Structure formats: C-alpha cells, structure tokens
Amino acid sequence: MDDAVCPTETDNVQNKQKATTPKRTQRRGGKQQLDRPERALFCLTLKNPLRIFCIKIVDSKLFEYFILLTIFANCVALAVYTPYPSGDSNITNQMLEKIEYIFLVIFTSECVMKIIAYGFVLHTGSYLRNGWNFLDFFIVVIGMISTALSNLVKEGFDVKALRAFRVLRPLRLVSGVPSLQVVLNSILKAMIPLLHIALLVLFVIIIYAIIGLELFSGKLHKTCRHSNTGEYLNDLDELHACGVGFKCPSGYECFDDWVGPNDGITNFDNFGLSMLTVFQCITLEGWTDVLYSIQDAMGSSWEWIYFVSMVILGAFFVMNLILGVLSGEFSKERTKAKNRGDFQKLREKQQIEEDLRGYLDWITQAEDIEPDPDAQIIEDCHKNKVKEVVSIDNLKDHENETQQTDSWFRSQKKYLERINRRIRRACRKAVKSQAFYWLIILLVFLNTGVLATEHYRQPIWLDQFQEYTNIFFIALFTCEMILKMYSLGFQGYFVSLFNRFDCFVVIGSISEMVLTSSELMAPLGVSVLRCVRLLRVFKVTKYWHSLSNLVASLLNSIQSIASLLLLLFLFIVIFGLLGMQVFGGRFTFKPEEEKPRSNFDSFYQSLLTVFQILTGEDWNVVMYDGIRAYGGVFSFGIVACIYYIILFICGNYILLNVFLAIAVDNLADADSLSTIEKEDESQIQLDNQIKNEMENEEYLQNGDHISFKAEFGADLDTYLQDEECGSYSDDENTYNKLGGVKQRVSSLPRRNTNTDMDRIKKDIPYGTSFFIFSHTNRFRIFCHRLCNHSNFGNFILCCIMFSSAMLAAENPLKADASRNIVLNKFDYFFTAVFTIELVLKLISYGFVLHDGAFCRSAFNLLDLLVVCVSLISIFFNSNAISVVKILRVLRVLRPLRAINRAKGLKHVVQCVIVAVKTIGNIVLVTCLLQFMFAVIGVQLFKGKFFSCSDGSKVYESDCHGTYLFYENGDINKPRLKEREWKNNKFHFDDVAKAMLTLFTVSTFEGWPTLLYVSIDSNKENGGPIYNFRPIVAAYYIIYIIIIAFFMVNIFVGFVIVTFQNEGEQEYKNCELDKNQRNCIEFALKAKPVRRYIPKHSIQYKVWWFVTSSSFEYSIFVLIMINTVTLAMKFYKQPEYYSEILDALNMIFTAVFSLEFIFKLAAFRFKNYFGDAWNTFDFIIVLGSFIDIVYSEIKTKEQALATCDGQSCNKAKGGSTLISINFFRLFRVMRLVKLLSKGEGIRTLLWTFIKSFQALPYVALLIVMLFFIYAVIGMQVFGKIMLEEGTSIDRNNNFQTFPQAVLVLFRSATGEAWQEIMMACSPRDDVKCDPESDAVNNCGSSIAFPYFISFYVLCSFLIINLFVAVIMDNFDYLTRDWSILGPHHLDEFIRLWSEYDPDAKGRIKHLDVVTLLRKISPPLGFGKLCPHRMACKRLVSMNMPLNSDGTVLFNATLFAVVRLPLAIKTDGNIDEANAELRATIKQIWKRTNPRLLDQVVLTGNDDEVTVGKFYATYLIQDYFRRFKKRKEQEGKCDQTENAVTLQAGLRTLQQNSPALKRTISGYLDELASEADPMHRRHHSLFGKVMSSLLRHEEITSSKIKHLSRTKTIPYQVEFLQHKVQLERNKDCLTSASDDISIEKIIRKQNKYNGQYFNSEANFMDNIKYTPRYDGEEYEMEDPKSKDKDEEF
C-alpha cells in the first residue's frame, strides 16, 4: 500500500514542477509575441512562412554573431584603405571598393529581414523604434544612395562625404557589450544636466565673442613689410602682428594687408571666427598666442584682462561643472546597476530556494515510505557476511606480508618525513619573519638602484657590474621563490596574488637572461622584457598596508575602466576612420613645405592624431590644417572645424572626465573597505594566535600522526590571514590605510582648537623665559600684553603687507638701481620691526624648552626663519656671496607670516596640508610607476634623440663644417650655416632626465613633438630616420593612459574627496547633513525684500505695466534681437551696412532708455536704484548714450577734416582707445541682463555667486602662492635676455612683477610651461640681458624645482580646490530634483515680497496658503495641491501666530524648509524642538535668541500657532462635511440621539457670523478665488473669542445627555470647555482666549493619549470612527471624497 502511495506523491511533485516550467517559458514567449505586430508592412501576418523564417533568423544568436563579425571585418576593410591626394588610388583601394558592395548587401539583407520580422515603424516594438536599428537603417540608406550616385554620375560629383557615414557602423558593437552600456548610459543620462551647462558655456562664449568682435575686429591684419621690396618680415618662419605693441624694425613699415595669424583663422573679424577663437581659448590651447598677437597689435595695457577673465570664468569654472555633473551621474548609474544586479541575485536566490524547498518536500515524502523490514534484515545479514569474509582474508595477507617484508624502510620514511616537516616549519617561520621581510625589501631597493644607474655613455665596468648584479639578484629572487614554495607548498604559495606576481617576475627575468645571452630576440623586445624586473618594486606594497589597499582599489577600478577603455578605443577608431575619409591625403599644402606629422593619411597615423586631439595637446594646430585642407576661412573650409570641436568635446570633456568619475567612485569603495578591514584586523590576529597555538599543541601531542589539515590546511589558513592582516611590523600601524581620510582629517579640528589664537593669547606659559623672566615678571607680562594687543597685531600685518609689496617693486636687472637703494632702506626698517616683534614674543612665550614656548609652533618657526634670513642678508650685504643671494630670495616668504594671523587662511592651509598627507600613498604609487616607465624609456631611447642641424647627415662623425640653407625654401636666398650636433631638449639619457621628460608628458604638454622624435629615433649616436620605429608610440599611449588618464585623475579625485571631507569635519558631530545645514543657514540669515507699490493711480498703472510678465518678455525678446544685431558686424563691412547697424543700435538704445524712464517713473529714485539690476540697466543706458554721442562727434570730425593722410590716421588712432574699446562694451553688457530672466539661469547664477563666496580664503592662498613665485621668478630669472623665437621674449618674461604673474598664470593653465622652464634652465643658448649687471650664467638650475613645484601646486592642488567647491555647490544639478536645496529658497523671498511689499517680515496666515500654492514643489505645494491638503500641511508646519493673525518671514521660511527635509520632525515634538535649538546654537553661535524663539518653538503650551489654528479649522470642516453628507442621505427615522448630534454640530458650525468669517476665513471660497496680491493687516483673535462668548449658553445637562448617548468624545470635550468659557465670561482676557482655544485643541488630542503637532498624528486622530447607536459612520477622507479638489 505504502509502495503505491509514495511514487504517486513523488509524481505529483514532479508533475507540479513540469506544470510550472512550461508556464514560465510560455510567459517569456508571450512577451516576445507581444513585441511582434500582427501584420508587418500591412501584408505579412505572423503565420506567413517568409515572416516566420525572418523571425527565426533575426532571433538566432548565430546571426547576431555573424553581423558583429561582419561589422568587425568592415572596420578592418575601412582601416586598410589608404587615402591619396587628388582622387588617386591603388589596386588595394579598388579591391576594397568592390568588397564594400558585399558589406552593403549583407547589411541591407539584415535590415530587410528585421523590418519583416519586427514591422517597420507603426508598432511599439517595431524596427525604427529602436535607436540602434535607426542608426543601421540610416547608414544602409546612405550607403545605397552613395553607391547609386557614384554609378549614375561618373564625374563631377564627390560622394566621399556620404561614404563617410560608413564609419558609424562600429557603434553597433556597443549594443553587443553590456558593460559598455553602463558607461554609455551614465553619459547619456548626464546629457540633461549637461545641457544646462552647455547653455551656460554657450552664453559665456557668445558674450566674449561679441566683446572680442567689438574690441579686436580687424586688429590682426597689420604686419611688417619692407618699404621697397614689399617682402614680409619673418625671421622666425612666421609672421606676427604689428602696431602699438610691436614696432617694425628700420626699413620696414606696418601694412594693413595681411590675412592674419594661422592663415586668417585666428581672429575676431566676424561672429563665427570670434566664437571659434574664444572656444579655443577656453580649451586652454593656444590662448597665449592669441593674447600676444593682440598685445603686439594694440599694446599691453588692458587686453590681458579680457583673456585672463575668460580663462578663469570659462575654463576653470564653467568647464569644471561638466566634471561635477559627470561624476555625480556616473556614481548614480553605478549604484543603479549594482542595485539591479543585487536584485537579480536575490531573485535567483529565491528561485533556487523555491526549487530546494520542492526537492526537500520530495525527499521528506520519500523518507516517509517505509521499506520492507524483512528484506532489510536479509540485506544487512548478507552485507555483514561479505564484510566478515573480506576482513579475514585481508588479515591473513597482512600477517604474511609482515613476516616477509622488513619494516626498516617504513621507519626511515617516517623519520625523513618528520625531519622534512620540521625543516618546512622552520622555513615557514623564517619566511614570515621580520628579518626576511626587511632583507627582501632591501634587495628590491638595491636591484632598483642598480637599474637606475643605467645611462647614456656609461663606462664598460658599469655595464659588466649591471650584468653580474642582475644575475645575482635573479638568483636571490629565485631562491626566495623556491624557499617559499617549499615552506608553504604549491597550493599555499599560489593562493596569494603577490606570490603569483613574484613567480611571473622571476620567470620573466630568467627568460630575459636566456634570450639576451643566446641573442634570439630583437633588442627592443629584450629591453621591454628587462623592465619586468622593475615590477619587483611593487613587492613593497605586499608589506605596506596602506599601499596594498590602494593597489587593490586600483585593481578594482581597472574592471570599471576596462569597459571605458573599450568605449574610448571604439570612439578613437570611429573618429580615426572618419578623419581618414574626410581629411585623408589632404594635408599637403605647398611642395616645399613638409607635411604635418599629425595627419590622417593612414589608419595608424589617424589613430595617433585622434588620440592627440583627445588629450587636447595642440588640437587647434591640427584643426587649422584641417581648415586649410578645404580651402581655408574664405571658402567651405571653415565647416571642417565642426569635426574637431565635436571630437574635442566628446573626447576630452566627456570621456576623460568619466575616468575621474570612476576613480572617485572606486576610492570611496576602498575607503569603506579599509574601515571594515581595520575593525576586523585585531580579531584576525587573535584567531591567528589561537590557530598557531593549537597547531603547535597538535604537533607536540601526535608526533608522527599530524593530520593533513594541520600540515597543509592550517598553514594555508594562517598564511592567508597573515597576508590579509599584515602582522609583519609594528611600524605598519603608524601608516593609515588608503581610505583613512577620515582618521587623518579628524585630527584637524583638534589641532585647530589647540592652536586657536585666542586660547594661546590668554595665558603666559608657566616656566622661566631664557632662564631669566619668570611668568610673574612685570616686563614679561608687559611684553605679553603688547604682543597680544589687537592694534600691535594689525600693525605687524600692515608691515608684512608693505614689505611684501616692496619686494615686488624691486628692479631685477640692476641690483644697484636707485629704486632698489630706496627700497633697501625701507627693508632695514621692516626688518627692525620684525626683529623687535620676534624678541617680544620670545620673551613673552619662552624659546623652546617648556610647553607653549615660541618654537613649539610650526608657524612661529616660519616667522623665525624669515626674520633670521632678513638679518643675515642685511649683515652680509655683498652680492658676491651666492648664499646671500639665495637668502635674499627667501625674504619672499614674508607673506606666509600672514597665515598665522588670519584664521580662515590658516584653516585652508591646514586643509591643504592634510590633503597632501592623505595623498602620500597615491604620490608614491605614481612615482613607482613613473620610475618604471623612466627606466623602460632609458632602455628604449638613451642616446637616440641626437640630430644634426643638416638633415642629410645621420651620424655625429659626419656633422661638421657648413651647409647651404635656403631661407623659407626660396632658392634665390642661399645661406651658409654651421652644422651642429644637438640633443633634444627632453631626452631619456638617464633616469632623472627620463622622469622629467615623462612628467611633462603626463601634463599633456609637448608630447606629440616628443612622440615623433621617438618614432624617428634610430640607434645610439645616430640621427633621426623618418618613421623608423612607429611601434614605440605604444609606449607613450600606455604611459598616458596609466599615468595621465588614470593615476593623475585618481590623484585629483582624492584631492577633491579630501577637501570635501575636510569641510564636513567641522560639523561631524551634529546630526544635520550638508544640505540641511545650508538650507537652515539660508532660512536664518534671509531677509524679506522690499517691493514698492505706488499709491498714485497713474503711477500705479505705469508700475503695473513695467512689472507685468508681458513687459518682461518683450524686453527679453528685444535683448535677444539686439544680440543678433551685435553679432552681425564683420570686418570690412560696407559703409551702408555700418550705418544700418548704427541706426539699429540707436533704436535699441532708445527702447532701453524708455524702459529706464518708465521704471524710474514707476519706482521713483530711491526704490529704482535700490535694486542692483536696475542700477546695472542705468549704467548700460548711460554708457550707450555716451558711446553714440562720442562716435557721432568723431565721425563728423573725420568727415570735416581736410587733412593729409598722416594726420587723419593720427586722429583715428586717438579716437579708438576710448570710443570703441570702452564704450562699445556697454552694448554687449545688455546681454548680461538675460541672466536676470528665467528661473533656471537665475538658480545657476545664484549658485555661481555662492561658489565665489565660498572661495575668498582659497583665492587669498592662490594670490599668495602667485605672489611668492612671481617675486622668486623676478629675483632668479629676471636677468635673462628677451630674445625672439625663445620662450622668454617681449611678451613673456620675469622682468616686471605683472609680467611675472602673467607667465605664472600661463604656466598654471599648462600653456607650454615646459618650454619656459627650459628657457630658464642653465643652457648655453640662455643669454643675459645687456642692461643687467650679470654677464653670463643667467639661467639657473632652480628652474626645474621652481616650475615643477609650481605646476604641481597649481594644477593638482589649488585649481582642484575650485573644482571641489564647484562640485559641492552644483551637486543639485545631478541630485534628485525633488529634494529641497538652498537654490530653491530664493524663489520664496521673491514671492513673499508680493504679499509683504514693505518688507515688514510678516503676512496674514491666510496668504501663506496662497503663497505656498504659487511655489512649485519641493519648496511649495504647487498650483495643483487641493486647498484642504494645503491647510493640512500648515498644521504640520506649525509657525507661531501673532495676535493680529500674521506669521513671520523667517519662521515661515524655516518651517517650509524643516518639513520637506524632515529636520527633527519625528517623535515628541517638544523634545525634537529642544534638540534642534541646541544644534542651531552649536553651529550658528551668533544666532539671535529672539529669532531662534520665532523659528523653533519653545515647549510653552500657551503659544498660539498656525498648526493649532488650522487643526481647529480642519476639525470643523470635517464635521461640516460629515453633517452635509448625512443630510443628503435624508434619513427620516432619526432618533432623538441623532437630533442631539445635529444640534451639537449646529452649535459648532453656526456659532456666529464672526466665528465663521474669522476662523474659517472663507477658506472654501478662497480655494477657487484668484490669489490676492496684497492684503491689509487686521485683528483676529478678539473677534473669534467675542463671537464664542456671545453665543447662547449650553447647559451641563445637555452635555451629560450627549456623553450618555455615545456621541463623538472630542465634540463633548469641546462643548465642556465651551461651558467653562461661559462661566468665566467676565474675567477672560485676549490672552486667556488664546489659552482656552489652545486647551480645547490639546484636550481633544488627549483622547488618544498623545499630544500631536505633526500631520501624521493629526490625521490619525481625525480618522477616528465614531459609533452611533450600533451603526458605524466613517468620517470622509478628503482624498477619496473630495473629487473636485483632487490633484
């Protein structure tokens, strides 16, 4: 019976599973069926055999792989194609043209099949509804059109432009790789916030382009020509502008007929070219060239302001917003993808658990089946018998074997095993010992040191030494590897990642040695293999915890970055192929000119050029060539710039910033990882200790019989844990892990408080000063008081500033110049002052021995150093001593003394110091990588960068004597020149020079030039051969990706994260997040804005007109039209065209003047000029008038003047400076008015100003840095001769302070900073200025540390402070838009002024509802919010209510902020308020107590609040509605109880007209009425209470009756209190009225045993269901019942 049951149950379970399985597939199939339309192309149904066939093919994986393979093959075909100039071709290209037809057929077939399968366009899942399919279809159609056209029209039609679209096919590979889609999705999601920024960038570009057009139009067309021959002056192979700044030499004149710089591309002649030039400047490439050209033409008085402001605003601020948005979006996208993955895993886990449960059920059911007991007994007996027989046989065999075999071998084997185990144990102990660890580290560094000694022209003995030491180190590291393998066993050894890495390095090194000695491999391959040795350097990371953590996080990043690199590669391939199609073979301009190295003539070269543009280095030069290739500016060529701009924006701004986004994201992960590890570390070490002890015990007890687990497994466990927790050295604990930003940073506030100036000033340190002055000594007390007097401090600060300014005023050329002598006298005075201050402080605080002594503070030591340096330089005032020169330079550290005297500045400096400490590990890893690449570079390129000035000579031995040189390729101008054998400025002849070269490459400056020098490099002592080793480009690309894209971005990311964390430290103990703090700060500090409303009827009408939205829009449109007319100007425009533009300008000026007059009439003087925008408008109108008048006068003067050409020219020159160059700006400034229009732009502008407010100390630090470096630059490099063709010339030098600052600003933007560094270094071609007192050696070795340190400080640290601030303030662009932020709150102030025009700071509580309904969420309720819902929200807001029915501005704004951000709104409201008050006092210490009482209520029960008032109103409203519904039901059989209830309700509702008017405030009517603009204040509570008191008396018997009949409890409470009011009628005051109302509400709430002030609790009480005579009546819910007021 049981046997029969069991299979049935089992079958049932299996049948269930079978039943469920097809359902799932069916459902999936169903989904797919849904995607298919019933008919495709109006005729093919789902049962059509052709369509079924197409669906099968399209859905198969094989087809998908085939198409991807075809795309890849198509890419290869496009890459093999070689473009030739002038339409030439070769056999390969012709073959490829034929193959193109095959590809076209395949892609067309795919397209047709998919259209048949999916339908064309009408259905939701149809073919063209998918973006990738649309792209395919577009490419196929273009391909067919281009093929048809090329066959039909044989000549005169170029289809190349159409064919170029083929290169978009590789984009389809993205749809095949999921990891690519995460990166691409995050970029696409970022497009919406990026669009906001794009508009801002466009706005900045347009403004600067129009200013440039007005100021510099036609200025760059003058150049020097010979007076007689008419030849251009071009000593330096390129022409430059002449004019005020650059005077032509004798024999030459300045003529106005030059096309302009870069073949006329770089100029401001029309709006288009002006925009292109501005965009180029914002990308920081070639902006100094444009500036210097303008300065040559117009002088250098003010032009730099235009360019410097453009760079700061455009490049540093606006462009960094892109970075902020991308990093925000990427982390959001990553989190989404991670959550999606986690959810998927959870679902899979649930599915597995479900299946497991099914199986368990099946198993348990199977266990229930009892087998036949008799059969079981028989089976057992049979088994036992078999076992018995076998064991007897075995015993007999064993006895025989023991007798035959001697046991000696076995005992020996055991003995040897025991010894082996002991040796292994000893080896393992040795391998894990401190000594072994330090020995290996020492060997690694020695090996590294030996590798670093390699250099060009090294002696033979060094070669041999390196060879032998290499063999020695290989042997040692091999021994280490074998020892570890033996002690840990193979499995134990290879389980560690570092050991696998070691093994790889050792095997690589051995194979390299074998290949080198047998000469089987080419030298290039060997030199790369040799560098595998360098990876040993990373063995350090195994033992250094913080480093190993960083390396681990970097390895994690590589997974994310692999997909980005794939996308980057795809991007480069597509643009490379497109470049080949468009520009291939076109970069040949003149026969005598050499073709530019960056071109698109082959696929390989095209990839290199695109990669160069991607890095941004000299992208503008390639663009100029592209424009010239199509005929230049004066033809179709200018369109070519679109390709380069799109490539630059997508590549440089978007893709490369995603690198940074990934870096920051992974660093955050590493941070959390480190914290967890740190917590677990002690536990792991404890476990280790226990395991080791247990293992030893087991060994001692069991002797020979140690289990496999004890020998192998425990070792493995222990080893793994040792690997993890690093119990190697106690010193390691002193190092924090990578993520220890918080630990390190957290020490800062403590340090800050310890060094707080005020606390130091309080007491004299205990102990004697200089063993003379005790702490009670009067003289010491006097000194202490004097030092700490505020006036004394201010005086010293002024002295510091003046003495610093004098350092900047010195003449660097002549030390004995009269100006310097005067300044030196002042210097003596300031040094005396500083010495006196120092002595006073030393007496006051003591020198060094006791706590609080002067020298115990780092900042005081800085003071001491500066004063000592000044004293030494005065006493040894002889210029002969070079040490004194250096000491005089050190005086420039004086401004740093100001840091100790300005708290904010000190905080920023400490923040930077913390950042530098935190970044130490990253710097170390970067240096290790840099060092590795430098050694590889030395292997590859040492001694190979030499060249002869005569290109025909390849070797040094041939490079002697003279050669003929044709100037500008003109055969009529031969010149004799000496041959010179020169090394390149940057080379790899030794490791130090290689690291310098690589550092410049990592800054992206000048690397393409270096790349082509490397490609042409031949062999040691050999000259260049064109394209000799193209493969070496891989070295630079790998270096740039690893170091510049990845490591530098991680570095920058870490700086940003550290600065942001540092900012948070101040508030780490308060419970508010950053957004909540910002919003509360805004609410506390905000003030209402005055809104003037005239009383005179005519003036009111004018006011109403100018404040209306239609007037605003019309002005907006006029500004837009004005912008268009300003942009219509161009160089050499006809006379009549200029007159039209002038007339239009007059019209616009008249219109804007009318606007000014109307507004002045409406607002009067005081109110008009009270608004900053109005003042700005007035200045513009005034400036425009002056501009018109001035221009007209000058035009008439020129027309009337009957003079010779020379004096006319003079008149023109005089007029341009003021008229055009200044007053024309007022026309452009009208554009800025656009910023006041539009909420989005207003928000951006507000955040921008806020960013600037957050930057004063950062800006001060930058100013100080620039000042110090500029003065050092003047002192050290000021004597270098200004020479044309070098980087130190008339525009770029250190001879004056402003010039030095400009050079530094240029270096900070990275504009060829390495060229300036080389021009200041000690080289033979660096000459001294003839006016200086120096004869030679004007270059200095200080140039290298000077420029490198400045670049690192500026580009990596200081500029990133800007980025950190911007990312902090603009995070709302990527944040969820529904979260309230400070940027929303400006709208509240603006709309409040409509209800409170006099800015009294209070409005009627009734107006608050309409105000908040006007404001969109998240700040307000929005127009769609039902009126009653708005009242409910007001209950939760609960601001204090004044006796006249008004609420206060700050209280309302605070409540508006507090509710959406849920700032202390949970739990008991009184406790929450108390906590919030304490928090506000803690963070904003200077908050006015009265203001605090207004915004956060005290726990006083007697306070009347909006919450209590609207609670009362809502209770009434609910009852009114309840009664109305009951009346409508029209029940006739109402009992007396029902009548009583109605009476109670009527009592409430119809108390008096005054009650209805004041308490309900006609709220129902108000909901439908138009929002009132302004209201008059009137009293409220007097009327409420008098109306209550005038009502008829309610007897207590009535109340008792009501309570007996189970009526609504809080209604009874209300009525009881009504009686109480009647009894105390005579003694009630307005104050007690307030109290009684409040008590009523509180009593009614106490029914449920809780006192509420929050919306949720209020709603709980309201929804109480009253019972009446056994029937249950549910109060109506406004959400469900009130349909007319729904959202």
Swiss-Prot record:
Composition bias, kind Polar residues: at what positions? 9-23
Give start and end residues of every IV repeat. 1096-1370
Cite the binding residues for Ca(2+).
285, 617, 1005
Give the way it sits in the membrane.
Multi-pass membrane protein
Q: In which tissues is it expressed?
A: Predominantly expressed in the larval body wall musculature. In adults, highest expression in thorax followed by head and at a lower extent by abdomen.
Q: Where is this region: Phenylalkylamine binding?
A: 1337-1378
SUPFAM superfamilies from the entry? Voltage-gated potassium channels
Please give the name of this protein.
Answer: Muscle calcium channel subunit alpha-1
